[in-house]
Amino acid sequence: MGEFMNSGMGIILTIAAQGLLVIAFVMISLLFLVYGDRKIWAAVQLRRGPNVVGAFGLLQTVADAAKYIFKEVVVPAGVDRPVFFLAPLISFVLAVLAWAVIPFSPGWVLSDINVAILFVFAASSLEVYGVIMGGWASNSKYPFLGSLRSAAQMISYEVSLGLIIIGIIISTGSMNLSHIVEAQDGAFGLFNWYWLPHLPMVALFFISALAETNRPPFDLPEAESELVAGFQVEYSSTPFLLFMAGEYIAIFLMCALMSLLFFGGWLSPIPGLPDGVFWMVAKMAFFFFLFAMVKAIVPRYRYDQLMRIGWKVFLPFSLGWVVLVAFLAKFEVFGGFWARWAMGG
């Protein structure tokens, strides 16, 4: 048995099994994410939300997914059929692909590569192609305008996200997500995590993540009052389901990145309590709760306001922060205290 597992076929089967586990976790989480999002939104609006299908409405998401899958796929006249159907698949696959390098605990990662942050950033950046392809292939003005908005918005806020991540890389000296979490380990629990020395960047990362995932109040590419449903107007059935699933998976990915980069990942916030997967999942769930609350209580921005904030506020501030972190780390200002603190020392 040991010889087989060390053989080429054994390694391939092991990687395939691990990949299926990651996909299973993402898909099961997706069911609860949609359910939780709808429940939180309903609670803010003093409604009950899903409560009929299954206990407490837990099976409502399953019923909705089945409804989408078995619906007829309506293809409008004049669309580019290959590109039209390829677009949602690209968005979904890229959203799932990024989870291959997300560690949940020491050893609980599909591929613990040294350029994990770069891999995640590349996969999330490529998702914009699915949106652009879907809007262009639909042969309709509303999807096309929505896709153009989405492309401009995602590219604008990816710059800020990249600069924020560079600050973390400078502090850690590594692009490996496991190493970044290990650098935040210390005797003071949550006060060793990067949220404290990089506090301004936590807020910027959260807001940029909202814009990057087209989440309210930055859901301009699919603003109902302006573009109906944006680039998704002409989609129905399974293709629409893939777009929606990719969006929620990308949101949960941003929650995972916030947990890993700023809040210690699987590390316990209280010294003495054991570290583990529980803390990682709990932090991700908390950040998704914040995403859902923002959706429920913050009004939508105008498109010009969104772009102005991204280029005139977030970009210069995050760039200045990178310069500051690099200066403090290089010249060991304040006797090296800040550098050792920011580097987990």
From Swiss-Prot:
Q: Which Enzyme Commission numbers does its entry carry? A: 7.1.1.-
Q: Where in the cell is it found?
A: Cell inner membrane
Q: Which InterPro entries match?
A: NADH_UbQ_OxRdtase_su1/FPO, NADH_UbQ_OxRdtase_su1_CS
A cellular-component GO term for this protein: plasma membrane
Q: Does the keyword Translocase apply?
A: yes
Q: Name one GO molecular function term.
A: oxidoreductase activity, acting on NAD(P)H, quinone or similar compound as acceptor
Q: Which membrane topology describes this protein?
A: Multi-pass membrane protein
Q: Which UniProt keywords apply?
A: Cell inner membrane, Cell membrane, Membrane, NAD, Quinone, Translocase, Transmembrane, Transmembrane helix, Ubiquinone
- Catalytic reaction(s) noted: a quinone + NADH + 5 H(+)(in) = a quinol + NAD(+) + 4 H(+)(out)
Q: What class of enzyme is it?
A: translocase
Q: Which domain of life is it from?
A: Bacteria
Membrane-spanning parts: 11-31, 50-70, 84-104, 115-135, 161-181, 187-207, 248-268, 277-297, 309-329
Against Pfam families, the record matches this protein to: NADHdh
What's an example GO BP annotation here? aerobic respiration
GTP-binding: present as a keyword of the record? no
Subunit relationships: NDH-1 is composed of 14 different subunits. Subunits NuoA, H, J, K, L, M, N constitute the membrane sector of the complex.
Q: What does this protein do?
A: NDH-1 shuttles electrons from NADH, via FMN and iron-sulfur (Fe-S) centers, to quinones in the respiratory chain. The immediate electron acceptor for the enzyme in this species is believed to be ubiquinone. Couples the redox reaction to proton translocation (for every two electrons transferred, four hydrogen ions are translocated across the cytoplasmic membrane), and thus conserves the redox energy in a proton gradient. This subunit may bind ubiquinone.
Say which family it is in. Answer: Belongs to the complex I subunit 1 family.
Q: Which PANTHER family match?
A: NADH DEHYDROGENASE SUBUNIT 1 (PTHR11432), NADH-UBIQUINONE OXIDOREDUCTASE CHAIN 1 (PTHR11432:SF3)
Specify the protein name: NADH-quinone oxidoreductase subunit H 1
Gene from which this protein is expressed? nuoH1
